[in-house]
């Protein structure tokens, strides 16, 4: 069982780049690991943007900039396109992000994030631009993500937007359940349904 998701208020890490694909999130050479080793994948999130070929740090990349921190990643439009590798969601979760905000997500990556207890919050392009502007002007800008109410709020401007989420996934996040946990939790109901179903 994972940590339950309710309301998160945090400063943000801005990544105002569109069309970030899964190979940029976690390069293919790290896909040999087939178990979810969160620290390994988190350490290599955006590896080729964070480090030069010789392993030295790219000082001006946002994850290396101490100005920005928090458990919310604010990303440009069309986040998570490309191959369907679940490792990309592992890397995001492993780094410590609990929320990713963008104006559009690739469907498969969006589902992979949900399956790994990262909440993808899709907002309008206008709201996303406002977030980037607020964070740029004040890196201590906080954003509140309220899963029960399905709202995201820029605490600096007070502006909020509603976001959509599958009802089942919302239930799982709020109760810290993955698919197996959910089935185990509802095992008795499943058995009752099976016993009550006639076979023709």
PLM regions and their residue ranges:
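Cytosolic catalytic domains that perform sulfur/thiol-centered chemistry
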Residues: 1-200
């Amino acid at each position: 069982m994972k940590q339950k998701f309710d309301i998160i208020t945090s400063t943000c890490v801005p990544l105002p780049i569109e069309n970030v694909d899964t190979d940029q999130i976690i390069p293919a050479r790290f896909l040999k690991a087939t178990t979810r080793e969160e620290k390994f994948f988190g350490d290599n999130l955006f590896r080729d943007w964070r480090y030069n070929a010789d392993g030295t740090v790219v000082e001006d990349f946002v994850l290396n900039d101490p100005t920005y921190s928090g458990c919310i990643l604010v990303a440009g439009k069309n986040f998570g396109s490309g191959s369907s590798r679940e490792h990309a969601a592992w890397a995001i979760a492993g780094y410590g992000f609990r929320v990713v905000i963008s104006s559009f997500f690739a469907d498969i990556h969006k589902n992979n994030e949900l399956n790994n207890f990262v909440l993808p919050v899709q907002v309008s392009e206008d709201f996303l631009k406002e977030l980037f502007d607020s964070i740029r002007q004040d890196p201590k800008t906080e954003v509140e993500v309220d899963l029960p109410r399905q709202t995201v709020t820029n605490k600096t401007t007070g502006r909020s937007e509603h976001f959509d989420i599958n009802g089942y996934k919302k239930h799982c996040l709020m109760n810290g359940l993955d698919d197996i946990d959910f089935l185990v939790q509802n095992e008795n109901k499943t058995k009752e349904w099976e016993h009550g179903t006639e076979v023709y």
